Amino acid sequence: MTDKHKDSSKQFLYCSFCSKKQHEVRKLIAGPSVCICDECVNLCNDIIREEIKDVVKNSDIQILPTPHDINNHLNNYVIGQEQAKKVLAVAVYNHYKRLHHDTSHNNVELGKSNILLIGPTGSGKTLLADTLARFLHVPFTMADATTLTEAGYVGEDVENILHQLLQKCDYNVQKAQHGIVYIDEIDKISRKSDNPSITRDVSGEGVQQALLKLIEGTVAAVPPHGGRKHPQQDFLKVDTSKILFICGGAFDGLDKVIERRMDTNNSIGFSAIIKLGSDQLNEDKLLTQVEPEDLVKFGLIPEFIGRLPVVATLNELSEEALIRILREPKNALTKQYQALFNLEGVELEFSEEALIAIAKKAMARKTGARGLRSIVEGILLETMYELPSQLHVEKVIINEAVITSNTKPKIIYREPDNKVS
């Protein structure tokens, strides 16, 4: 009689939390006088994960590296551009300090410190922004301004930038709101003349207008799956006032605009003095004298310039700087390829003359640091193709002739082990 009673009670086991019976769930875990189903376990896990996210989010704001710490980290990955790194370090520190300040009870409202980077191709603009984001452990995304159009026209809406940022943090809105957005080629959306256009300029001034609110700070409605907005779909609300926007561009010809202004103001002043140096030195020095009115003359609208209060200029990299980039940073190009060859059990060596030749080639191409990888990849292509099929290779040596005369790298073989055990 007792055994029969026990058997009947087993048939009526149910979850102590949701009251679902055993046959209604996939798994029911029983404990002393209590049971829990797999659905409730998953729900508890979700609740705990959200709590942990909130704790991590709050602790990240509390622990803020100083401008010195930020600059020192940038030095590990970015060669040269000392003034730009210092400007960025202070601006980034002030931005995240402002976010922390917003949580305190103070009536003083701090403005955003969005950043405009001006410098030639391959000078390190994108690398600076990416390195900052990785150091601060915040989401980072990069957008190309030339692909953006006004809402309603063929192309990408500016809100797609936020969608890309959300993707980087698994659609965690709170985390995305502490992220960094880098908009490249911002100079390419300048209007064609100083006067406002009476026709639609959907990829120039129109994009600047579309970006205004986004950069300044607004609550944007972002489609969860990207693309165009539809009235039927739900939107994610993203507060962009907490997102740091960094815009960058080469601004070819801006030095001439600055020079004309300075010549008009004082023909025997700074502009006349720097003409005594080299052309590149002139351009670098002129860019450091940039004023908002110069950017307006170039084609950016005043309202857009006002949203980018911090301006940092980057110099064109010298041959010496390119050589340092090849070997000094923690993720230097030569170190990356040496690690790649080590996976094959082979040592890769670059002679000093080879590094100089690579730098000279990049200077001739006028591609800056960006062109270094394509040069190194080109000279190592055949070796990397053949190496996995070759036996007993001990070392590969890249000398100057490999770069300048397209000769094959020197390969040193180890003695085969012929000992019979």
Swiss-Prot record:
GO CC, any one term: HslUV protease complex
GO molecular function annotation: ATP binding; ATP hydrolysis activity; ATP-dependent protein folding chaperone; protein dimerization activity; unfolded protein binding; zinc ion binding
Keywords: ATP-binding, Chaperone, Metal-binding, Nucleotide-binding, Zinc
SUPFAM superfamilies reported in the protein's UniProt record: Glucocorticoid receptor-like (DNA-binding domain), P-loop containing nucleoside triphosphate hydrolases
Disulfide bonds: none
Subunit and interaction comment: Component of the ClpX-ClpP complex. Forms a hexameric ring that, in the presence of ATP, binds to fourteen ClpP subunits assembled into a disk-like structure with a central cavity, resembling the structure of eukaryotic proteasomes.
Family from the record: Belongs to the ClpX chaperone family.
NCBIfam families: clpX, PRK05342.1
Protein name as catalogued: ATP-dependent Clp protease ATP-binding subunit ClpX
Protein species of origin: Baumannia cicadellinicola subsp. Homalodisca coagulata
Gene of this entry: clpX
